[in-house]
């Protein structure tokens, strides 16, 4: 069974309080921008910048609740995350508040796998953007809720495994670097070893150019 996102989610966006009004900024209200999402984004519960309740009121911002699937709609298109708590956003999003018919994690993994497709839907001359209508008309396979949750769990476990392997590789890289420094020192400590030129310990050979008309 296929379903339109507009039939199973409420699509919402946001806006930016005036930057010239200091009373709107540096409060305790979470307010995100697309730049805060990256390839490792999953559940986010805080923002880089914060606004005040006055900024919320004067700008007419509407909050989206925990569990909302966050989707960047421009600059760039297709970054995704899940809101870990109630927050607000700027105009660079088309976020999806899920109904009881769809699991937010299932929707997150679906959209994460469709970044190229989402980018192909972008419209605009100066920079591409996907509109609310475009997002609402995207279709998604919609199995029973139990199957959605089972799929989400499998992808979550895979994500954990990938992150574990990534951490292990980073630790191994640091181990190799520290071992190298331990053996050879830093770039400023080479005088702890005898030094010589490459020519002293190896024969340097070069190739020649063969004229193709003569030898082929």
Regions found by a protein language model. Name each.
Residues 1, 30, 69, 87, ...:
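Residues that recognize and position ribonucleotide moieties
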Residues 1-15, 137-152, 167-209:
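Non-catalytic DNA-recognition/assembly elements of restriction-modification systems
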Residues 6-21, 35-66, 199-215:
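Sequence-specific dsDNA recognition surfaces
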Residues 15-16, 74-77, 82-94, 108-143, ...:
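Glycine-anchored helix-breaking recognition loops at helix->coil/strand junctions
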Residues 33-34, 48-112:
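A short beta-sheet element
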Residues 40-42, 80, 149:
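Short helix/loop capping segments that flank catalytic or ligand/cofactor-binding pockets
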Residues 102, 145-146, 159:
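A generic structural signal for alpha-helix starts
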Residues 158-169:
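Amphipathic alpha-helical coiled-coil segments
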């Amino acid at each position: 069974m296929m379903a339109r996102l507009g039939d199973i989610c409420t699509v919402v966006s946001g806006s930016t309080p005036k930057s010239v009004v200091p009373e709107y900024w540096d409060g305790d209200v979470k307010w995100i921008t697309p730049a805060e999402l990256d390839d490792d984004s999953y559940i986010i519960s805080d923002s880089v910048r914060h606004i005040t309740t006055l900024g919320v009121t004067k700008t007419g911002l509407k909050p989206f609740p925990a569990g909302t699937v966050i989707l960047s709609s421009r600059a760039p298109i297709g970054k995704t995350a899940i809101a870990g708590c109630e927050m607000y956003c700027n105009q660079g999003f088309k976020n999806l508040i899920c109904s009881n018919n769809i699991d937010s994690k299932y929707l997150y993994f679906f959209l994460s796998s469709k970044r190229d497709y989402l980018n192909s839907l972008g419209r605009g001359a100066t920079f591409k953007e996907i509109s609310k209508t475009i997002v609402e008309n995207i279709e998604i396979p919609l199995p029973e809720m139990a199957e959605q949750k089972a799929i989400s769990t499998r992808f979550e476990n895979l994500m954990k495994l990938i992150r574990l392997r990534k951490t292990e590789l980073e630790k191994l890289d640091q181990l190799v670097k520290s071992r190298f420094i331990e053996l050879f020192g830093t770039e400023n400590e080479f005088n702890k070893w005898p030094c010589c030129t490459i020519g002293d310990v190896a024969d340097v050979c070069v190739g020649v150019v063969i004229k193709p008309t003569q030898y082929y």
